[in-house]
Design a protein with these regions (language model features):
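A charged N-terminal "starter" segment
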Residues: 1-109, 113-120, 124-126
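Conserved radical SAM core fold
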Residues: 49, 70, 91-93, 134-149
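Conserved small/polar residues in nucleotide/adenosyl-binding loops
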Residues: 163-170
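Short beta-strand segments
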Residues: 127-133
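Flexible, glycine/proline-enriched loop segments at strand-loop-helix junctions
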Residues: 13, 100-106, 144-157
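Short acidic/polar capping segments at secondary-structure boundaries
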Residues: 89, 109-112, 133-138, 158
């Protein structure tokens, strides 16, 4: 890789970012959103170099977070939408999660039941979803299999009923 400066002057460890490449990729992502109507979010678990968020902000709809602190980072440094998912949410964090999140993914119907009153009483619309385990994996090694018994990769389809899927129309307290 050819760099436009001498690496001899760098103090290590350090990160070197190709801002031009970041902007080119951002333009591609922005055009995909414009052409399809989809929203593309930055997965902070994979890339949380928040010093680059001001560069990426014009191209993306927001961020995803796997917990309260990632959600705060996304809200404060990137802005836009904040989508949060987690195998479990500490009850004491939930008021703050509701204050900064636009979409919350729950890992089970039990979690939704536990936290829905916070969502409903937060004073602004928050969309919610349930993470469904695909119950199918290409890998044979259990260590890498997201579908093994006891997995934290969402609920299986078996407990999902028509009532769950239509809950917003049939439960008065939702």
């Amino acid at each position: 890789m050819h760099l436009p400066f001498s690496t001899d002057s760098l103090q290590t460890p350090c990160y070197v970012t190709d801002v031009a490449a970041l902007k080119r990729n951002g333009e591609i992502l922005k055009s995909v959103q414009q052409e399809t109507g989809c929203k593309i979010l930055l997965a902070q678990k994979a890339f949380s170099m928040f010093a680059t968020y001001p560069i990426l902000k014009p191209y993306l709809a927001g961020t995803t977070a796997s917990g309260l602190y990632e959600a705060k980072l996304g809200r404060e440094e990137m802005g836009g939408e904040v989508h949060i998912f987690s195998p479990a949410y500490p009850e004491q964090d939930f008021p703050e999660i509701c204050a900064i999140s636009d979409h919350i993914v729950f890992n089970s119907f039990h979690q939704w039941q536990l936290h829905k009153k916070f969502v409903q009483s937060c004073g602004r619309p928050i969309s919610c979803g349930i993470r469904i385990n695909p119950e199918y994996a290409e890998v044979e090694t259990d260590l890498y299999n997201p579908c093994i018994p006891g997995s934290r990769m969402g609920t299986t389809i078996s407990p999902v009923s028509y009532t769950h899927l239509r809950a917003h129309e049939t439960e008065a307290d939702l």
